[in-house]
Each structure stands twice: as C-alpha cells, then as structure tokens.
Design a protein with these regions (language model features):
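ACP-dependent fatty acid/polyketide chain-elongation machinery
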Residues: 1-67, 89, 247-259, 354-368, ...
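Flexible, low-complexity linker/loop segments at domain and module junctions
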Residues: 1-8, 95-98, 293-299, 330, ...
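Condensing-enzyme catalytic core mediating Claisen C-C bond formation in acyl metabolism
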Residues: 5-9, 36, 216-293, 302, ...
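Conserved beta-ketoacyl condensing-enzyme motif
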Residues: 8, 29-164, 193-204, 297-313
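A glycine- and small-aliphatic-rich helix-loop capping segment at beta-alpha/alpha-beta transitions
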Residues: 22-27, 112-129, 179-182, 202-215, ...
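Active-site-proximal alpha-helical scaffold in enzymes
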Residues: 78-91, 145, 150-153, 159-194, ...
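Glycine-/small-residue-rich "gating" segment that lines the acyl/pantetheine channel
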Residues: 123-133, 174, 178, 194-251, ...
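Short glycine/threonine-rich loop-to-helix capping motif typified by GTGT followed
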Residues: 270-279, 308-325, 330, 344-351, ...
C-alpha cells in the first residue's frame, strides 16, 4: 500500500525559555539560558542547586482550576502544550471526526513529585494507618497526560504513552507518524512532558553524578561539546506537534509548518546509563531514519543533537555523526538546544523536534551556547559546525533530531520543507 504523507500543522510548548512556542523559539534563537537557582524546593543541601524551571507557571491559564488540582505538574504542562497546539492548528472541533484524532505523549518518569509527596506523608503518619489521596495513582502514572488531553477534547483515536527515558517523546512522534501514514488516524496530538525537578529527581541524578554542579554560575552550566562540561542541567516542560495526514490538512486549508518524512529507532545494548563509546546506537538510529525518509546524508542541513553536556555522550554522538554523514558532516549545522533549555528528559524530543520544525520553516539554526574552551579529545572535531554561541541563518531543507535515553534507547526523526 502507498503510505500517506504527514505534515505538522500546529505547535505548542511550555519550556524554561517561555510558556508558548513563540516565546520559546524567540529565546532559543537569542541564545537565552533557562537555568537559575531552584525555586521548586529548598535545594540548599543538594550537590546541584539549580535547574531549568518553567517560569511564572499558572496552570489555570490553560486548565480549569478544579481539573488542574487533580493533575501532577507534568500533566498540567502536557495539557497546556496540547491546548496551544490544537488552537494553533486551527482544527475545527465541531467539524473534525474526533474518532480519527489521537493523542500520543512521551513521558520518561511521570508524576514523581506526586509520588514523593504521598510517600513522605505516609512515612510521617503511618502510625495512624495507611491514608492516601484517591488521586495519588491517577496523578502519578505516566499515561495520564495523554488520557487527560483525550478527555479534554473528546478525541477517540489512538491514545497512549511512550516511555523510553529521554527518547520518550521522539518515540511518541514516531508512533504518531506511522499511524498517520498507515491511514489509522487523520490527526494526532503528539508530544511529551516531564516535571522531575524535585528532591527525588535532583537527588537521584546527583547520586549518579549525572548533573552539573556549577552552582556559582547556573546560566553557563549546560555547555555541550566544551572542555569544561561537567554534566547535564535538569529541565522541565512540554512540547506538542499536531501531526496530520496531508490530504486532511489540505482539505481544511491548514497552515503547514513542515513535513515529517522519517523516523528511526535503535538500541545501544551496552550500558544502563552510558552511551556506547563508539556511538554505535546513534549511528544505527540516524541511518534508520535516513533510510525511512528515503534521503541521503547530503539532504540534511541541520542536526539537533542529543548533546547533553556529558563527557562521553557528546564525544560518542560526534563520532556517529561523522561516520554517518562523512564529508557532509562538515557542511551541515549541528546544535544542542539543551544548552539553553536544559535536559527536559521525556519531553526533550518533542521540544527539540519543534526546534527542528521552526529551523526548517524559518531557515535559522539555534545556537549551542556557553562554548568557551575546546576539548582536547580529537573526536569532538571542531571542524564541525556546532553553531557555537550565536544562531546562524542558512537554508534548512531538512532537519534531523536525535534523542537517546537511559537503557540504550535511541530515536530519531526527520522534518523537511513542505512542497507539493
């Protein structure tokens, strides 16, 4: 059967750079850091005392007050991004066949703050007998964001959550893409959300020695591909892409941001938390996405890298890019928007895919900020264009986004300019 074409017709985002996709993109292009001292809890005694938090967050701008109280922060962020995306798409909710509209969101951890609060309450009061909120489980579970969005809009199409650590929302986009091109839905609200900036989240990653401890200079802490990088900066947020079958989008006169043309998945099969030192999984996933899109390496102008600002991860991804793209690796642009947003964990792929869509539609590549010192490891290879410290205008025919998760999960998606 002939596969259908899939386009992006709406965007939504709540990130450390802004509470809308427009504000997020504007600050991304400007090279603004979202890092600051933690305000969501008292981090005085933690090794890491800063993060990339969503600022000025008021869920009631997007969600009914009564409903918001029944949601963990991650689900609130997810809902806000979906509301924005659906509005931006111009979907007529009275006319669209809601049986053919789905919701797929990627979530890496889910309601960790809800779990933390309930466990703490139980520990302090267990002598009185077990007492838990009836909303404990529905607020905590990772699938509830997709469910809440579906309920809010009355969408009856495919509805589920993908969980593959930091690759979660890229897998959500990939699953949505495949369902649409197979004709199993007309529209899918696809994205991801995460809100793990809490004692358990920061403490857990600190215990793994995964986080930067640059407490005296948070805004310069996330520095992918720079010699002095010392770990990732935790972020939170949500991103949404409205993916739509092309003929359905054309029939309703929808604005089209870009076309989604390929996706890939692979596994490192190497280590629970470390990427393969030779970039094997990264190489395989990019090759898979290019093959799926029926594109050559030379067709890609921009790679939004996983680029978390860890020593091994940045090196292995650079190796993989050079192996897959050959000489063309030196002609395209590479950047890590995590240098600005921090690592949004399960939401990273959705927000970074949004950055790729905007790069394709506006012909500008956001920067990798905070670079001030070259790494001595030759594999980083500074002949590559990492788009250091300042956005670059260029023709972006197609953009590729990488996300890699604990457990060796790798996912990749490709977007290109839409043409008839």
């Amino acid at each position: 059967m002939e596969l259908k074409r899939v386009v992006v017709t709406g965007l939504g985002a709540v990130t450390p750079l802004g509470n809308t996709p427009e504000e997020t993109w504007e600050n991304m292009v400007k090279g603004v850091s979202g890092a600051a001292p933690i305000t969501l809890f008292d981090a005085t005694n933690f090794k890491t005392q800063f993060a990339c938090e969503v600022k000025n967050w008021n869920p009631n701008e997007w969600i009914d007050r009564k409903d918001a109280r029944k949601m963990d922060r991650y689900a609130q962020l997810a809902m806000a991004s979906a509301v924005q995306g659906v509005k931006d798409s111009g979907l007529d909710l009275d006319q669209v066949d809601k049986n053919r509209v789905g919701v797929i969101y990627g979530v890496g951890i889910g309601g960790i703050k809800t779990f933390e609060e309930e466990a703490s309450y139980y520990a302090l009061n267990k002598e009185k007998g077990p007492r838990f909120s009836p909303f404990f489980i529905p607020k905590m579970i990772a699938d509830i964001a997709a469910g809440q969005i579906s309920i809010h809009f009355g969408f009856h199409g495919p509805n589920f959550t993908t969980t593959s650590a930091c690759a979660s929302s890229t897998n959500a986009l990939a699953d949505a893409f495949n369902l649409l091109r197979l004709g199993k839905a007309d529209v899918i609200v696809a994205g991801g959300a995460e809100a793990a900036i809490c004692e358990c989240g920061v403490g857990g990653f600190n215990a793994m020695k995964a986080l930067s401890t640059r407490n005296d200079d948070p805004t310069h802490a996330s520095r992918p591909f720079s010699a002095s990088r010392d770990g990732f900066v935790m972020g939170e947020g949500a991103g949404c892409l409205i993916l739509e079958e092309l003929e359905h989008a054309k029939a309703r006169g929808a604005r089209i941001y870009a076309e989604m043309v390929g996706e890939g998945e692979s596994a490192d099969a190497y280590h629970l938390t470390a990427s393969h030192p030779e970039g094997l999984g990264a190489k395989l996933v990019m090759e898979a996405a290019l093959a799926d899109a029926q594109m050559q390496p030379e067709d890609i102008d921009y790679i939004n890298v996983h680029g978390t600002s860890t020593h091994v991860g940045d090196i292995s991804e650079a190796k993989a890019i050079k192996e897959v793209f050959g000489e063309h690796a030196y002609k395209l642009n590479i950047s890590s928007t995590k240098s600005m947003t921090g690592h949004l964990l399960g939401a990273a792929g959705a927000v970074e895919a949004l950055a790729c869509v905007k790069a394709v539609s506006e012909d500008i590549v956001p920067p990798t900020i905070n670079h001030d010192e070259e790494d001595k490891d030759p594999e980083i290879d500074y002949a590559l264009n990492y788009t250091f410290n300042q956005a670059q205008k260029r023709a972006v025919r197609a953009a590729l986004s990488n996300t890699f998760g604990f457990g060796g999960h790798n996912a990749c998606v490709i977007f290109k300019k839409y043409a008839e």
